[in-house]
Swiss-Prot record:
Tissue-wise expression: Expressed in telencephalic neurons (at protein level). Expressed in brain, spinal cord and testis.
Gene name of the encoded protein: Ngef
Phosphoprotein as UniProt keyword: yes
Domain of life: Eukaryota
Region spans: Disordered: 1-141, 187-226, 679-701
Keywords recorded for this protein, A-Z: Cell projection, Cytoplasm, Developmental protein, Differentiation, Guanine-nucleotide releasing factor, Membrane, Neurogenesis, Phosphoprotein, SH3 domain
CDD domains hit by this protein: PH_ephexin, RhoGEF, SH3_ephexin1
Positions of region (Regulatory region): 1-264
Protein name: Ephexin-1
Function: Acts as a guanine nucleotide exchange factor (GEF) which differentially activates the GTPases RHOA, RAC1 and CDC42. Plays a role in axon guidance regulating ephrin-induced growth cone collapse and dendritic spine morphogenesis. Upon activation by ephrin through EPHA4, the GEF activity switches toward RHOA resulting in its activation. Activated RHOA promotes cone retraction at the expense of RAC1- and CDC42-stimulated growth cone extension.
All copies of domain PH, residue ranges: 480-592
Membrane-traversing stretches: none
Length: 701
């Protein structure tokens, strides 16, 4: 097998912004086999130790322009002057990525001598570059070293990448729906495949050879079967769906030497870039087709237009700059070094525009509904604009919610990258940093939305309350509603003078805040008369079991210190088992029960994935997006689940009909492992102390 000669050292080493590809090796200990023509010449050369050139340095940029301006005839003349065979001419000159089908793969061809020669010599000794795994056993399982070699020899022309971006025909809404549906289907196939392998393994226990074959199958899956989430995005207007389907990738031969896991990582990073291009296209359509429509400008008052579109221009400007940097990273090499360093920088310095936009969501939705109801001209014009083929049948509301969907999806895309990078590597550290920054942005967005809606909700509740006891201030910046609803209070069997039994239960209404419980009775005029209250931390609950049909779904609520500074006990009946469980979970979340214990962290905890989106109807419910994975903490007989979402650890109730259970224990274990890896930057000592406090509070009860 032919290999690079010493001139392979001529390509300047590629470095990312966060120095992810630092030089970590000394002089090469092994040299690849050289052709007879060049072996003697190379042996007589004195070893040189050169400092690698930074990717964006002035020298490196000048060299790239110089090589780009050089004509093909000049390059051939240089090759002939170096006594190279005609059949081994280089096809990897910087920024000249025209790869004829008849030429040899680029890792077999020499490059020109230049800075970074020392590490190029080491990289040329990796498997796939002329040395077999038997000759270099230490490098057999070293995809990172192999990737560093590839980083130096595969530039991609800017025009090729820009053409790819322009040919993306999917709007972001289409991409998002198809991507999540494909993710669900991929999990189903993996679940069924691994279950099939497990069944086959058990059936062949008596045959040692068959057992070994079955164990090897899941460990070495076919390289092309591990498709990323974007693989179903087939579209007549978008030729390229996968990184490995790009003509430059196909003709370069890198797929023959990349490890399968590195290929998956490349696909994950490629999806982040192409999805950002699709998102920018949808934002641009929102601005050009809707916001800047002259007829719409005349219909809307400036204040209405400001609330409706908010700072979408700022969001689009940030997306444009973000996409431009991602494009530049793609142009540098077909083998992508990293994108998380760019994501981290933008999340830390520029993504605050998303917080501003999303925080306005409550007013935006209300204004949009009012305009549709009150302004006929607005409603008719929007309907007309939505019929335009550009919109592909999508409503304006789907465009207005794009920024919040994107910032959430971006965090998941970084998680997908994080799952595939090498553990302990610098790329893992950068991905963790990017994920942490994105998580902070998403939390700030959620808090912004909640703050706006909570303030209005607290004002509305305060107006409806009449206090029979000492008044309690309801409105507070640190207080919000967790749950409200009607329950039946058991008053006990009492007999009137006419010997007719009074009603065993009577209705009461509860308002549960994050720090306060208010117990009321509903009175005419949509008002509530408050007759008792207690701090939430002084509540205890107890479930009554096997008490017959009359006491079904009954639980005891104990106030350790109520409004009169006394202990009070209420026997309450809910309308269903799920309603009882939901009230008990909300009233005393730290009580000693199985659905708020550490079972969410156990490997045998049941899991489900969301197959139908669900919007929370109550504060204690959890909004679900397609492909969300959740641990089951509690499941009721009437079809409700209390679960914890893995990617953000949010808890809440949701209908079981919106999900399907993941049956295979290997898939569940893998999901938990990936979850632990994503969130491992959290302080373990802090989590341990928090768990100890929870355990202690339950033991005291």
């Amino acid at each position: 097998m032919e290999t690079k000669n010493s001139e392979d050292q001529g390509k300047p080493q590629r470095k990312s912004v966060s120095s992810l590809w630092k030089s970590k090796h000394g002089p090469a200990e092994m040299r690849p086999e050289l052709p007879p023509e060049t072996a003697k010449e190379t042996q007589n050369e004195e070893p040189r130790c050169l400092i690698p050139i930074q990717r964006n340095s002035l020298f490196n940029r000048a060299m790239r322009h110089k090589h780009k301006a050089r004509s093909m005839s000049e390059r051939r003349a240089n090759d002939q002057a170096g006594d190279l065979p005609e059949t081994r001419k280089s096809v990897n000159e910087p920024l000249a990525f025209n790869l004829p089908q008849g030429r040899l793969p680029p890792w077999r061809t020499p490059a020109q001598r230049g800075p970074g020669a020392q590490e190029a010599s080491e990289s040329s000794s990796t498997p796939g570059n002329g040395t077999t795994p038997e000759e270099c056993p230490a490098l057999t399982d070293s995809p990172t070293t192999l990737t560093e070699a590839l980083q130096m020899i595969h530039p991609i022309p800017a025009d090729s990448w820009r053409n790819l971006i322009e040919q993306i025909g999917l709007l972001y809404q289409e991409y998002r729906d198809k991507s999540t549906l494909q993710e669900i289907e991929t999990r189903r196939q993996q679940d069924a495949e691994i279950q099939g392998n497990s069944d086959g393994s058990q059936a062949g226990e008596d045959n040692a050879e068959e057992e070994e074959e079955e164990e090897e199958e899941p460990a070495s899956p076919p390289e092309r079967r591990a498709l990323p989430q974007i693989c179903l995005l087939s579209n007549p207007h978008s030729r390229f769906n996968l990184w490995q389907d790009l003509p430059e990738i196909q003709s370069s031969g890198v797929l023959d030497i990349l490890q399968p896991e590195e290929t998956k990582l490349q696909e994950a990073m490629f999806e982040l870039v192409t999805s950002e291009a699709s998102y920018y296209k949808s934002l641009n359509l929102l601005v050009s087709h809707f916001m800047e429509n002259e007829r719409l400008k005349k219909i809307l008052h400036p204040s209405e237009a400001h609330i409706l579109f908010s700072n979408v221009l700022d969001v689009m400007a940030v997306s444009e700059r973000f996409l431009l940097e991602l494009e530049h990273r793609m142009e540098e090499n077909i083998v992508i070094s990293d994108v998380c360093d760019i994501v981290y920088r933008y999340a830390a310095d520029h993504f605050s525009v998303y917080i501003t936009y999303v925080s306005n969501q409550t007013y935006q939705e209300r204004t949009y509904k009012q305009l549709l109801q009150e302004k006929t001209a607005f409603r008719e014009l929007i309907a007309q604009l939505e019929l335009d083929p550009k919109c592909k049948g999508l409503p304006l509301s789907s465009f207005l919610i794009l920024p919040f969907q994107r910032i959430t999806r971006l965090k998941l895309l970084v998680q997908n990258i994080l799952k595939r990078v090498e553990e302990g590597s610098e790329r893992e550290g950068t991905a963790l940093d990017a994920h942490k920054e994105l998580e902070m942005v998403v939390k700030a967005c959620n808090e912004g939305v909640r703050k706006m809606s909570r303030t209005e909700q607290m004002i509305s509740i305060q107006k409806k309350m009449e206090f029979k006891i000492k008044s309690v201030p309801i409105i507070s910046h640190s207080r919000w509603l967790l749950k409200q609803g009607e329950l039946q209070q058991m008053s006990g069997p009492k007999t009137s003078r006419t010997l007719r039994t009074k009603k065993l239960f009577r209705e009461i209404y509860l308002f549960l805040f994050n720090d306060l419980l208010v117990i009321c009775r509903q009175i005419p005029g949509d008002k509530y008369q408050v007759f008792d209250s207690a701090p939430r931390g002084l509540l205890r609950v107890e479930e009554l079991e096997d008490q017959g049909q009359t006491l079904a779904n009954v639980f005891i609520l104990r106030l350790l210190e109520n409004a009169d500074d006394r202990e009070a006990t209420y026997m309450l009946k809910a309308s269903s088992q799920s309603e009882m469980k939901r009230w008990m979970t909300s009233l005393a979340p730290n009580r000693r029960t199985k659905f708020v214990s550490f079972t969410s962290r156990l490997l045998d905890c049941p899991q489900v994935q969301c197959v139908h989106p669900y919007v929370a109807q109550q504060p204690d419910e959890l909004t679900l997006e397609l492909a969300d994975i959740l641990n089951i903490l509690e499941k009721t007989e009437d079809g409700w689940i209390f679960g914890e979402r893995l990617h953000d650890q949010e808890r809440g109730w949701f209908p079981s009909s919106m999900t399907e259970e993941i049956l295979n224990p290997k898939i569940r274990s893998q999901n938990l492992k990936e979850c632990f890896r994503v969130h491992k930057m959290e302080d373990p000592q802090r989590s341990q102390n928090k768990d100890r406090r929870k355990l202690g509070s339950r033991n005291r009860q």
